[in-house]
Amino acid sequence: MSYTEEVYERVVAQNPGEPEFHQAVKEVLDSLKVVIDKNEEEYRKLAILERLVEPERIISFRVPWTDDKGNVQVNKGYRVQFNSAIGPYKGGLRFHPSVNQSILKFLGFEQIFKNSLTGLPIGGGKGGSNFDPKGKSDREVMAFCQSFMTELCKHIGADTDVPAGDIGVGGREIGYLYGQYKRIRNLSEGVLTGKGLTFGGSLIRTQATGYGVVYILDELMKAHNDSLEGKTVIVTGSGNVAIYAVEKATQLGAKVVAMCDSNGYIHDPNGINLDVVKDIKEVKRGRIKEYADRVEGSTYTEGVGIWNIKCDVYLPCATQNELGLDAVKTLKANGCKYIVEGANMPTTLDATEYAMENGILFLPGKASNAGGVATSALEMSQNSMRLSWSAEEVDEKLHNIMKDIYSKISEAAERYDMKDNFVVGANIAAFEKVVDAMKAQGIV
């Protein structure tokens, strides 16, 4: 049995009932086989893989809070501090009913590599709760956030662990969390990112992940003598990542014809009117189906199936495992040439393999959606220097980081004779940096 297989079997045996975490570890270990086989003796001796797949720390806690009817509710809170070899733990907080330890370990594990690719000194972590902010009043969300931070504040800090937002955690939640941290610790420091602009936030942070997806797509297309000009694009989701991916793709000359939310999808052959989407999702917090009522010539379809619409570029920006094998086969049959992940692991393993084997150029989320965490790290830099950069400065730094990520992952893939295999390239480039740092710091 190979070293990677041994480590994977051990992960499955020691972490039963955690399929998302198993999937993330398997994908990474499989793609790193060429590097691991080359350095197997040294890695075994130092137990590099065994240490890499085991979080440094998992914090689990109860979160009691009182709802508007005066009833006490109890949720579970978590923080997975996965790897700090290259810097303080960095990764989002997710508030969603589906949150459990497996999902957070998968996200935290992926975060190690994504953060490594940014070239910035940040380690990997993730946290959250099974609390659902949907349908809750502002007071209930505040009560929950304050209770959650009352425990979490013992384990985080500007040089220790710097959480950010994720699904269910936007500007409102970050504000409540930060206020409670400051109140308890009496410290005004960059302990959270995604903050409001009036209290230490960074310009472009909201747009960063979506913009970054399109910047790296643009680099990929340029490298293949192509451009976004005149291309038909589908973007799944309708949250921050999706909205700003649509905005940047449109600015670069593409026509985005479809978006969706968890209920269904809209198709607008004339190109999505982003002002209407922003009004529905950001102002009214409504459902995407309202778009079809407001924009002539557009249609709304209940349920899944957005991939049946013809496109040149498909950007999955909604949630994990949203894009399966049959969907990718349909995309290929309809002439799709590029799939660039905006969400975390939105494409299943078999769908990813099919795309790459059948000539679709595929960029994995750990590379393509790293713009968000990169800009979070830029927010940390601004906080520690007590500075605030202009939108143009932050956008330029983001653009350069995404260019740099593309060149790193394509170079790593070519070095191992796997040109255009960006899944392998991303994992190798990220892994090598983390391992070098782990080796230098001894057995810790």
PLM regions with names:
Residues 59, 64-122, 126, 130:
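Phosphate-interaction motifs
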Residues 96, 115-229:
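Glycine/serine-rich phosphate-binding loop and adjoining beta1-alpha1 elements at the start
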Residues 264-362, 367:
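Rossmann-like adenosine-cofactor binding region
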Residues 2-24, 220-221, 332-444:
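Adenosine-phosphate binding glycine-rich loop
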Residues 193-196, 201-308:
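Glycine-rich phosphate/diphosphate-binding loop of Rossmann-like nucleotide-binding domains
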Residues 19-22, 38-45, 119, 156-165, ...:
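Flexible, glycine/charged-enriched surface loops at secondary-structure junctions
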Residues 41-71:
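Structured beta-strand/loop patches that form or line metal/cofactor-binding pockets in enzymes
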